[in-house]
Amino acid sequence: MKPQVYHVDAFTSQPFRGNSAGVVFPADNLSEAQMQLIARELGHSETAFLLHSDDSDVRIRYFTPTVEVPICGHATVAAHYVRAKVLGLGNCTVWQTSLAGKHRVTIEKHHDGYRISLEQGTPGFEPPLEGETRAAIINALHLTEDDILPGLPIQVATTGHSKVMIPLKPEVDIDALSPDLNALTAISKQIGCNGFFPFQIRPGKNETDGRMFSPAIGIVEDPVTGNANGPMGAWLVHHNVLPHDGNVLRVKGHQGRALGRDGMIEVTVTIRDNQPEKVTISGAAVILFHAEWAIKL
């Protein structure tokens, strides 16, 4: 069977919204060099290649147009959505292996498609960014100290991929942000973190709006980012920002509106002793089109 190539929008059920990814299934007969060429040709921020695995249900390799990466949230949702549709799966739990290790993925079938949930890595936090570094980040976003939620740090958080959490007051016009990309790139080199995630909480709701800038790795702005919203959920628990029952915090993370690609990620944080223990991100997807590779590979 020739590789089938899919164009998928993840973290949305509406075409041309959310975050697009390429999916190639099956990809067992492709070499690493061929995978990289296909990812470059498709031009998505990430393309997922689904392969047979001896110790899990599926192995996935992820490629940007220029390099292989360990894992990608929206491409994972896209990949499992395609696999579920092709194989006609019902409600189930599967395990995937990747360069990031072994992860549990939950698949829920609905009348209009599937909802895919990915369990992320262990939450972690670096010391708050203070002094000149904090000021440089605020200045690079063309904000002021008065725009930041009082009493809360600007801080690197991770569930496998680190992002800088930047909590904004609700009245800040987040869609109007136009950061200094060169300044953010320079700061990335200083702090060893490539993603900046300003976000704000919708008043009275467990819902957020965010944007993710990562110019140091060639991504001016990512539409909807699982590896930003997941750490954000953990950060919100870590700093006791939103109310929860002591066991679970659920947050709807909205992103992509400023790019005309609005999407939504459901973030579920399992809590132990008032600290985040486990983070799961969930979302829908939609297949725009698929095609069989026409040339001999």
UniProtKB/Swiss-Prot annotation:
Its EC number is 5.1.-.-. Homodimer and homotetramer. GO terms for cellular component: cytoplasm. GO terms for molecular function: isomerase activity. Keywords: Isomerase. The keyword Isomerase applies. It is an enzyme of class 5 (isomerase). Belongs to the PhzF family. The active site is at 46. The gene is yddE. This is Uncharacterized isomerase YddE. NCBIfam families: PhzF_family (TIGR00654), PRK10281.1 (NF007625). GO terms for biological process: biosynthetic process. Pfam families: PhzC-PhzF.
